[in-house]
């Protein structure tokens, strides 16, 4: 299991849900090794001794954490070679971790993983700033605002490449899920999209488009309003790059209404093959989101339905998702 997202996006809060997923899979949670390099910071530096400088502890250990991270990759690679690698739960910010073009150690999942679960957190940058401050007050792990915003840019720039590296693989079972964590504390994140290998189901198109928006934020912002001061971060309707790549590179992409799972479009090899205008109008109410969708998959003028009726739907009981969707929640 590999969870990716910006700093303070809620990666660690997914662990209870991942534990329940392991139970559904019949895998003993105690057999998982947790890979979370940020925890090492507290072993590298005595936070209490820093006084007022404690808020800069993260930056003061950045180089050391990078060294330990690389050593861990090599160690896990060795464990894999001797067939002693445990199940892994990977909570890492690094977006080069386990990418296909990395050196030997970082290709660990490619070489030794059989079933891979990828979780991508989509959290508004302004929310990560607030949550990071609260986390710092509670646990002493502070990050500066510009560092957090830069992490958001790196995260949302890195998600597409890492996603496509895995979703198109033929030799592994790759489950993936994008989760909206811009929700109140204590609530379950919402499933934005999910799938298995070469099929993708999109439930919240507006939130998926935020991946493009969030990677273009103003890292020098000093107010929430200034975060989206750049035009490219505010208007992605004219150029929804990540959505375009999904439709171009993933053989089957299905669009469905979030609350019911009712399907309103199916695109196969880049062509719109199924369409239900009524469900589409219920599911997509935001004008910019409609503009983004119709710029890529515009149905024929006046076409109300192509081989789809109102009963075609995705079933949450047939998925291995962690988030809320389809009007049900399988793992409270």
Stretches found by the model and what they are:
Residues 81-83, 161-175:
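A structural motif corresponding to the C-terminal end of an alpha-helix
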Residues 42-45, 99, 125-133, 186-188:
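Switch/connector loops and helix/strand junctions flanking conserved nucleotide-binding motifs
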Residues 30-32, 111-117, 171-175:
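Short glycine-/polar-rich loops that comprise or flank the Walker A/P-loop
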Residues 55, 113-159, 300, 307-313:
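A glycine- and Lys/Arg-enriched "phosphate-lid" helix/loop adjacent to the NTP-binding pocket
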Residues 49-52, 132-137, 192-196:
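Short secondary-structure boundary/capping segments
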Residues 27-108, 143-146, 156:
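Conserved nucleotide-sensing/catalytic segment adjacent to the nucleotide-binding pocket
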Residues 172-332:
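C-terminal accessory extensions appended to soluble enzyme cores
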Residues 2-23:
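Glycine-rich phosphate-binding P-loop
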């Amino acid at each position: 299991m590999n969870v990716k997202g910006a700093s303070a996006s809620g990666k660690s809060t997914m662990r209870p849900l991942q534990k329940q997923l392991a139970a559904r899979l019949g895998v003993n949670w105690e057999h998982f090794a947790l890979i979370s390099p940020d925890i090492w910071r507290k072993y590298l530096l005595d936070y209490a001794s820093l006084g007022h400088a404690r808020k800069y502890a993260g930056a003061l250990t950045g180089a050391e954490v990078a060294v330990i991270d690389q050593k861990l990759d090599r160690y896990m690679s060795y464990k894999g070679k001797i067939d002693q690698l445990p199940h892994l739960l990977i909570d890492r910010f690094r977006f080069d971790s386990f990418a296909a073009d990395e050196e030997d150690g970082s290709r660990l999942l490619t070489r030794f993983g059989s079933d891979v679960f990828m979780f991508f957190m989509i959290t508004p940058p302004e929310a990560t700033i607030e949550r990071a401050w609260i986390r710092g007050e509670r646990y002493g792990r502070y990050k500066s605002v510009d560092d957090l915003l830069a992490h958001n840019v790196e995260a949302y720039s890195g998600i597409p490449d890492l996603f496509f590296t895995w979703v198109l693989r033929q030799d592994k079972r790759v489950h993936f899920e994008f989760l909206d964590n811009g929700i109140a504390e204590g609530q379950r994140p919402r499933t934005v999209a999910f799938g298995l290998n070469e099929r993708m189901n999109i439930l919240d198109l507006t939130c998926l488009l935020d991946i493009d928006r969030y990677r273009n934020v103003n890292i020098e912002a000093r107010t929430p309003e200034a975060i989206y001061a750049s035009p490219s971060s505010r208007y992605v309707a004219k150029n929804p790059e990540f959505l375009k790549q999904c439709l171009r590179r993933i053989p089957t992409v299905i669009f469905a209404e979030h609350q019911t799972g009712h399907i309103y479009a199916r695109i196969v090899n880049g062509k719109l093959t199924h369409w239900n205008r009524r469900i589409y109008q219920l599911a997509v109410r935001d004008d910019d989101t409609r503009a983004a969708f119709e710029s890529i998959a515009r149905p024929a003028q006046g076409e109300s339905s192509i081989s789809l009726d109102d009963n075609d739907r995705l079933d949450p009981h047939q998925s291995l998702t962690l988030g809320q969707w389809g009007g049900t929640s399988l793992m409270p």
